[in-house]
Amino acid sequence: MKIRIDIPHHPYDIQIEKGCMAQAGQWLRELWQPQKVVIVTDNHVASLYAEKVKLSLEDAGFQVAVFDFLEGEERKNLTTVQKVYEFLVKQGLTRSDGIVALGGGVVGDLAGFVASTYMRGIHFVQIPTSLTAQVDSSIGGKTGVNTPFAKNMVGTFAQPDGVLIDPLVLETLGKRELIEGMGEVIKYGLIEDPELWALLTGLNGSVESILEHAETLIXHSCQVKRKMVVEDELDNGIRLYLNFGHTIGHAIEATAGYGKVMHGEAVAMGMVQISKIAEEKGLMPAGITQSITEMCQKFGLPVDYENWEVDKLYQALTHDKKARGNTLKLVLVPELGSATIHPVSLEEMKDYLVK
């Protein structure tokens, strides 16, 4: 299956196909002329797939080097970026060469940021290996790294030349790593896709059910992401809907310490908390919080953060990238399959942190 991201200045395709990683070289050869390529990955993904992808690219005529770093959200920072820059220089990469981001969201965000800033920008592609990356972070051109102040505080908008998604690689994920990706999938059903929500309702929540329906779940999610990215590439309007649950979710990630709470887990807890208060305020329909809670719990996602400290979470919220002056653009779901922007003051945002 191919999904076209038809952005006028930089259109590209998402290819979703079981087993397609084995043809990575052929796929990339259709996008780029033979040239130097650096695969950026983490040590865990490298042990599983780096050699396989490297050989496929070399068979297609590319000169390939591999840079890997220790896995984990806590490594998504400017220190790691500097190390990648140094490696690219040593490999002699020029503006006519490219980067292959092979890994989950941390790898994709960091490698995309490096590609968009090295020599003012070189080509890159995404080969995502986690469910979160396959349904969300590899698509749409947001890149970034964390700072001690906030998640993804330093970043760019830079579209890849293509995204290659192999659902079979999800079979090598640990249970927690697979399940956390369902936080984003559930979000897509809530904000835009009632058909996806119905599909999720029919699943029993097991790892086996996720893997069995992975290709369909990924396709639905990518279609929602495609629509919002094409209409609003730079995140000024409809694309903000994708941030449902993320305002509080990012604050949870930051206060917990990067890597302690996984992104999809934080999104799940954020969606439940936002919905609970919005429902109490009459801004979301009665019963929707219970529906979201039950859906998250069915797939094994957490719905409550045990280290809830309002002051720390509020401090993290003040660094939210969606803030404009003293106003936050909060995303709510007034009905299943529909989202809206609800501007709130930073002061009012404290209401949404009350347990």
Curated annotation (Swiss-Prot):
Top-level EC class: lyase
Presence of keyword Protein biosynthesis: no
Catalytic activity: 7-phospho-2-dehydro-3-deoxy-D-arabino-heptonate = 3-dehydroquinate + phosphate
Annotated residues for binding of Zn(2+): E184, H246, H263
Swiss-Prot/TrEMBL GO biological process terms: amino acid biosynthetic process; aromatic amino acid family biosynthetic process; chorismate biosynthetic process
Binding site for NAD(+): 71-76, 105-109, 129-130, 142, 151
Pathways involved: Metabolic intermediate biosynthesis; chorismate biosynthesis; chorismate from D-erythrose 4-phosphate and phosphoenolpyruvate: step 2/7
Cofactor binding note from Swiss-Prot or TrEMBL: Binds 1 divalent metal cation per subunit. Can use either Co(2+) or Zn(2+).
Keywords: Amino-acid biosynthesis, Aromatic amino acid biosynthesis, Cobalt, Cytoplasm, Lyase, Metal-binding, NAD, Nucleotide-binding, Zinc
EC number per UniProt: 4.2.3.4
Pfam families, per the entry: DHQ_synthase, DHQS_C
Molecular function terms, GO-annotated: 3-dehydroquinate synthase activity; metal ion binding; nucleotide binding
Entry's localization field: Cytoplasm
GO CC terms in record: cytoplasm
Classification via Gene3D superfamilies: 3.40.50.1970, Dehydroquinate synthase-like - alpha domain
Protein family: Belongs to the sugar phosphate cyclases superfamily. Dehydroquinate synthase family.
Purpose: Catalyzes the conversion of 3-deoxy-D-arabino-heptulosonate 7-phosphate (DAHP) to dehydroquinate (DHQ).
Name the UniProt record assigns to this protein: 3-dehydroquinate synthase
